[in-house]
């Protein structure tokens, strides 16, 4: 019989942290799961750390990419091999509360494709909770994702596998904000609901984070703005220009990016954002002229 939930974990050079993540999975009150851990061609002993769990529990499955494909590529590898009707994508350095799987699974109804939960943000250096992701996602959330009124973290969503496959999985060319890209696309075909309970500890800080840096942040923002440009400009132009201005300000901070990176970002910015700004400036000019005509 196939398991009810497939947990998919990408791992790259995670030998120091992945064991605690997998131990938390073993502690789940919901037992009918498989966990596919995808080693993204690591250079350290990540494989050996994973194989210790595979050896003691057959629910763990080891997969390995022949070349490094990034977190999204590893997630797609896991999705391709998943057997369950429900999938949960999880990061290799975060922790599940023991009732995560049971709580999300029992919260599903026939008219829902995605169940999300809340997440605590834990600072590694301070070893304490510093924030909470307590966004509420109900029904069709496509509009709310574009306007940034809601957010869905990678870890916090149990999803029907067929809707993941329907949108083609994760975008492997997305530099950052992969979960934003994924759920903008997923929300076009899926209906969401939120279990208002903290069930995950999301760790930030320290020297072992997977994705960090101004360069990747801006490149990811520009990727999203370019990919969904028409949707932003039609429904939420202010969100589009707000993110554009934030990206521009980060590019100007040369302390955070080197010259080569800055040149690449400026080129992306010119190609993606500048034409829309020209349209905005033109519209503002028409508005000013209209106001002058009204005053006369």
Predicted regions and their residues:
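Short aromatic/hydrophobic "clamp" motif used to bind/position activated sugar donors
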Residues: 87
């Amino acid at each position: 019989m196939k398991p009810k939930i497939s947990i998919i974990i990408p791992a790259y050079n995670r030998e120091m942290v992945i064991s605690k993540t997998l131990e938390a999975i073993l502690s789940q009150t919901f037992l009918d799961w498989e966990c596919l851990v995808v080693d993204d061609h690591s250079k350290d002993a990540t494989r050996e750390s994973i194989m210790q769990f595979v050896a003691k529990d057959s629910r763990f499955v080891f997969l390995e990419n022949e070349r490094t494909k990034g977190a999204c590529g590893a997630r797609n590898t896991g999705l391709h091999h998943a057997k369950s009707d429900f999938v949960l994508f999880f990061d290799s350095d975060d922790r599940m509360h023991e009732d995560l799987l049971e709580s999300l699974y029992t919260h599903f109804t026939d008219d829902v494709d995605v169940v999300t939960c809340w997440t605590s943000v834990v600072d590694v250096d301070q070893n304490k909770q510093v924030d909470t992701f307590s966004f509420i996602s109900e029904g069709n959330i496509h509009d709310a994702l574009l306007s940034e009124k809601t957010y869905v973290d990678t870890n916090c969503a149990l999803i029907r596998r067929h809707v993941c496959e329907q949108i083609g999985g994760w975008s492997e060319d997305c530099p950052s904000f992969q979960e934003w890209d994924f759920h903008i696309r997923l929300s076009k075909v899926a209906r969401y609901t939120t279990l208002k309970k903290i069930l995950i500890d999301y760790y930030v800080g320290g020297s072992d984070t997977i994705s960090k840096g101004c360069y990747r942040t801006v490149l990811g923002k520009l990727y999203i703005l370019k990919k969904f440009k028409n949707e932003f400009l039609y429904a939420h132009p202010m969100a589009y220009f707000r993110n554009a201005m934030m990206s521009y300000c980060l590019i100007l901070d040369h302390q955070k990016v080197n010259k080569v990176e800055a040149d690449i970002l400026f080129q992306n910015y010119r190609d993606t954002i500048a034409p829309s700004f020209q349209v905005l400036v033109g519209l503002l000019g028409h508005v000013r002229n209209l106001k002058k005509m009204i005053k006369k």
